[in-house]
Amino acid sequence: MSWLSKLMPSGIRTENTPAKKRSVPEGLWEKCSNCGSALYGPELEENLEVCPKCDHHMAIRARARLAALFDLDSPTTEIAAQLGPVDVLKFKDQKKYGERIKASQKSSGEYDALIAMRGMLKGNPLVAAAFDFAFMGGSMGSVVGERFARAAEVALEVGCPFVCFSASGGARMQEGLFSLMQMAKTSAALGRLREAGLPYISVLTHPTTGGVSASFAMLGDINIAEPHALIGFAGPRVIEQTVRETLPEGFQRSEFLLDHGAIDQICDRRDMRDRIAELTTMMMRQPHPQDADAA
């Protein structure tokens, strides 16, 4: 350091005086993947991960989704939380399945890709499940199927509606036939609900594909989708490569499916709680629920 630098006040910088780096906390700002706007993290979280500039629905964690659904002043009970995946087949591709499980559990903070809970929605009992895409792309393995089936059984015991928010890449290939069996298992669980006359509402979010879309995700008494969600069995690129034709614009998006009768409604995530409360009240022939938010 030169004699001039020693005499210079610390608040004055020159080209040769390095500026102190100001660290920005991780996650404080996020960029909208649709319009590119810089979004303040806490405000985006409060808006349920929906861009306030263009209304683009970004990914949201399963627990945040369920917390936004249930009444805040009522307790919730997680269903089959103790269940965790097991590498029965000792599957290995580029990495061992057991290692993938541990890595996903560490990065996501969840034991598997589906969270199921029992709680209250505007004063009425409800069972709901939500996929966490952060865990291995929301893929469906044995634990996902078992948690879904147990959640349906709880709804059957309580005598209340069942809601599932899907966000999945499909069946988990590392579990082979054990994963494919969950398609039949979950569908059978919904059959028991149907026999009891209890409603099942399926909410399809971005993306809902593969074995999940080919089973319980499309079996709702009412199928609701979030705006511009990708919904289908195979992805559009795979289909184009197979049929060697250009697909229509917006193919497999929720708006396209609504126009062609594949789903019943499209609902903004911020309105989803009120919409589900309205539908379940009507389907259960319950008195108009007390608005827990206003209480």
UniProtKB/Swiss-Prot annotation:
Claim: NAD is one of the keywords in the record: no
Keywords: ATP-binding, Cytoplasm, Fatty acid biosynthesis, Fatty acid metabolism, Lipid biosynthesis, Lipid metabolism, Metal-binding, Nucleotide-binding, Transferase, Zinc, Zinc-finger
Pathway stated in the Swiss-Prot or TrEMBL entry: Lipid metabolism; malonyl-CoA biosynthesis; malonyl-CoA from acetyl-CoA: step 1/1
Pfam families for this protein: Carboxyl_trans, Zn_ribbon_ACC
GO molecular function: acetyl-CoA carboxylase activity; ATP binding; carboxyl- or carbamoyltransferase activity; zinc ion binding
Biological process terms in GO annotation: fatty acid biosynthetic process; malonyl-CoA biosynthetic process; negative regulation of translation
Reactions performed catalytically: N(6)-carboxybiotinyl-L-lysyl-[protein] + acetyl-CoA = N(6)-biotinyl-L-lysyl-[protein] + malonyl-CoA
Principal location listed in the UniProt entry: cytoplasm
Record: residues binding Zn(2+): C32, C35, C51, C54
Regions annotated as coiled coil: none
GO CC annotations, alphabetized: acetate CoA-transferase complex
EC number: 2.1.3.15
Entry-linked Gene3D superfamilies: 2-enoyl-CoA Hydratase, Chain A, domain 1
Top-level class of the enzyme under EC nomenclature: transferase
NCBIfam families: accD
Protein name according to UniProt: Acetyl-coenzyme A carboxylase carboxyl transferase subunit beta
Species of provenance: Xanthomonas campestris pv. campestris (strain ATCC 33913 / DSM 3586 / NCPPB 528 / LMG 568 / P 25)
